[in-house]
Amino acid sequence: MLTGYRLMWMVVMFDLPVITKAERKAATGFRNALLDVGFQMSQFSVYLRFCTSQAQVDTLCRQVEQALPAGGKVHIFQFTDKQYERAISFHGRSRQPAQKAPDQFDLF
C-alpha cells in the first residue's frame, strides 16, 4: 500500500551560468530536460516532481545527472509526501494551501 511515508517528492534546485550564448543554451536544455521527465517549475531555478517510490526517485536522479550542463551548481532534494505536506508557501503575502499529491489509480 502506498502511504505518505513511501510517496516521495523531488526538488531540483540549480544556479547555472548564463553569460555566453552557449551557457544560455545549456541552461535552457537542462530546464527542458527536467520538463521532459515530468518536473514542474516552481520557481525559475526550482523544479518539483512527485514520485511513487524510491526506485523512481533513483531513476530520475540518474536522468537529471545525465542532463547536467558542464558548469553551475545543481542540488537534488528528496522528501516524503508527509514531510512535503508540511511546507509553507506564500504568494505575495498570502499563505497558499499545501500542494496535494496527484491522485493514485487503484488496479484490481
From Swiss-Prot:
Cofactor(s), names only, from the UniProt record: Mg(2+)
Known EC number: 3.1.-.-
Keywords: Antiviral defense, Endonuclease, Hydrolase, Magnesium, Metal-binding, Nuclease
Transmembrane keyword on record: no
One Gene Ontology MF term: RNA endonuclease activity
InterPro entries the UniProt entry points to: CRISPR_associated_Cas2, Virulence_VapD/CRISPR_Cas2
Residues annotated for Mg(2+) binding in this entry: D15
Gene Ontology annotations of biological process type: defense response to virus; maintenance of CRISPR repeat elements
Keyword Amino-acid biosynthesis: no
Pfam families: CRISPR_Cas2 (PF09827)
Uppermost EC category: hydrolase
Subunit-structure text: Homodimer, forms a heterotetramer with a Cas1 homodimer.
Function: CRISPR (clustered regularly interspaced short palindromic repeat), is an adaptive immune system that provides protection against mobile genetic elements (viruses, transposable elements and conjugative plasmids). CRISPR clusters contain sequences complementary to antecedent mobile elements and target invading nucleic acids. CRISPR clusters are transcribed and processed into CRISPR RNA (crRNA). Functions as a ssRNA-specific endoribonuclease. Involved in the integration of spacer DNA into the CRISPR cassette.
Similarity comment text for this entry: Belongs to the CRISPR-associated endoribonuclease Cas2 protein family.
Protein name in the entry: CRISPR-associated endoribonuclease Cas2
Gene assigned in the entry: cas2
